[in-house]
Amino acid sequence: MPNFIDRRLNPKDKSLGNRQRFLKRAREELKRTIKERVKSGKIADVDAEQNVSMPARGVNEPAFQPDSNSGERRHVLPGNREFAAGDRIPKRGGGGGAGNAGAGTGQSEDEFQFVLSREEVLDLFFEDLELPDMVKLNLKESVTFKRRRAGFSASGSPTNINVGRTMRNSYGRRIALRRPSRREIEALADEIARLETEPGGRNKHRQRLEELRQTLDSLERRRRRIPYVDPVDIRFNRFEPQPLPNASAVMFCLMDVSASMGEREKDLAKRFFVLLHLFLKRRYERIDIVFIRHTDEAGEVDENTFFYSKQSGGTVVSTALEEMLRVIRERYPANEWNIYAAQASDGENISGDSERCASLLHDELMGLCQYYAYVEIIDERETEIFGTTDNGTSLWRAYRIVDGEWPNFQMTRIAKPADIYPVFRKLFGKQPEMQLRK
């Protein structure tokens, strides 16, 4: 029987084993909390660390204990003036009871709060999406880095030594310490030689020669003590990692907000948008998100309005595509930005507009987009009705024509969270072949 030894280091002041056991025990509560955060939070913040609160009763490990509402106990209590021997003492009421009216007199407990790491948040988010393990690793993978110059350092590899900065420091140190120059020493040596070569100079300038020789000896000793280049002068080129690539992407989120799109449909759409954002965040340094919602009119809105506004009305899908085209022309030229689009709808559209949508995609948008994904959100009971992909609404049939002509267009139907991933399967399969626009 194999033995497994966990040699992973514990985080600072924490026990990794205890933390994992706690997360396993509280998994359902954490999944519910993360799901609520995904519903109410911003798409760009899903893969960040999360402060999670959960009831304190779920923190303690399971243990057997006496039932507080039944049983008989005998205690020896100190005497008092209120009770006599044989009196029955009522049980203490508590705030932990089943919903008593009023504040209560017992003690209650605050919620337990702790921080989930980015990896733990993504694990909980991916759990019911049924992503393959390799895709999970790709989405959670940190961005690649390239080393770039970032100043100088006093330590480093000899291959990174900066000669110019080193000699500059050496020169400043020699000036500050008054290191004798070669010119001064040569001038003294020439003066001594001149006096010695004069007729009778040795006797005539004996005292002067002695002073010059002492000065020369002192300068040479000082020059030897103060090196030309000292270890404190040496500077190395410093490098620090910076994320790659230096490309920018914009993600357009288009959604039908007519009356037929309820909370369930919007929740599935948001999960789809989150997954696409995580994929793009791994590939690009900067990502802008543009939210466009439409009924019979379309407009660019903020994220809160996009998901939670109560506006409703008819359905004209082409207005959203026209709004997207307008925003691209004004702010996101295709030669500078990598454009991705995700459209969520229940498939309802006004008569005759679906052909207009297909024409806009074919003639205008698909040539600008790196990838366009359309998801049609249906009821689980409808999955059997639409057994073949050719059946469906007029919008679905019109988009099938676009799907056959453009390889960067993908469409699918989703009825539950596990259906979201297949729309990315084609994108992940073609990832090495896709070329970024520069």
Swiss-Prot record:
Top-level taxon of origin: Bacteria
Start-end of Gly residues biased regions: 92-105
Spans annotated as Disordered: 55-107
Entry-linked InterPro entries: UPF0229
One of the Pfam families matching this protein, by short name: DUF444
NCBIfam families: PRK05325.1-2 (NF003707), PRK05325.1-3 (NF003708)
Family recorded in the similarity comment: Belongs to the UPF0229 family.
Full protein name: UPF0229 protein Smed_1028
